[in-house]
Structure formats: C-alpha cells, structure tokens
C-alpha cells in the first residue's frame, strides 16, 4: 500500500517539496500573480464558474425583463393560424417600456 504525502499550504500544486525557494521570492505578490488571477472566475477553457446571484441582482434582472418580454396569455380565439372568434381589438398596443419607446422614435 502506498501512502501519499500531504501537501503543505505554502506549497503550490505544481511544486514539489524542494522547490519552495520560488514562493519565498514572490512574497506578497503571489495573490496578484497573473496566472492566479485567471483562476478567480473561470474554469477550464474559459467557461465561467457558476455563481449564485444575490437576491438584489435577481430582483433587478426580473424587473428589467418584465415589461416587454413577458408572455401574455391569449384567449382561445387568438391563435396564429386561423383567427376566428372575437375581432374586437384590431389595433395592437405598443409596449410602453423605455427601451421600446426609444426604438420607435
């Protein structure tokens, strides 16, 4: 049975036990090392690590999308192919959100 040696916290994953002299030279710069910055928000091949959104952010996103992207429930006579039934409202009302109003003018 082979026993694996535990790595000390000062050792980086790519260093062996005899290569500690490089980490001493870097000192405090280890946190700001460009190679380590890459690992902060990303994983393999540039895919971004999933992070849970805060409630504040979720609320903001939900509020922003709500105006014109919300799917409206149509009654049974509002079908795309065969428009039979009530023809009361022929004019379609425009969305009044800021984004849509800006596109109209």
UniProtKB/Swiss-Prot annotation:
The modification Phosphoserine is found at residues 8, 10. Residues 1-74 are annotated as: Disordered. Proteolytic processing into mature chains is required for histone eviction during spermatogenesis. Transition proteins (TNP1 and TNP2) are required for processing. Testis. GO terms for molecular function: DNA binding. GO terms for biological process: chromosome condensation; nucleus organization; spermatid development; spermatogenesis. InterPro entries: PRM2. Residues 33-42 have a biased composition (Basic and acidic residues). Residues 43-74 have a biased composition (Basic residues). Interacts with TDRP. Belongs to the protamine P2 family. This is Protamine-2. It comes from Rattus tunneyi (Tunney's rat).
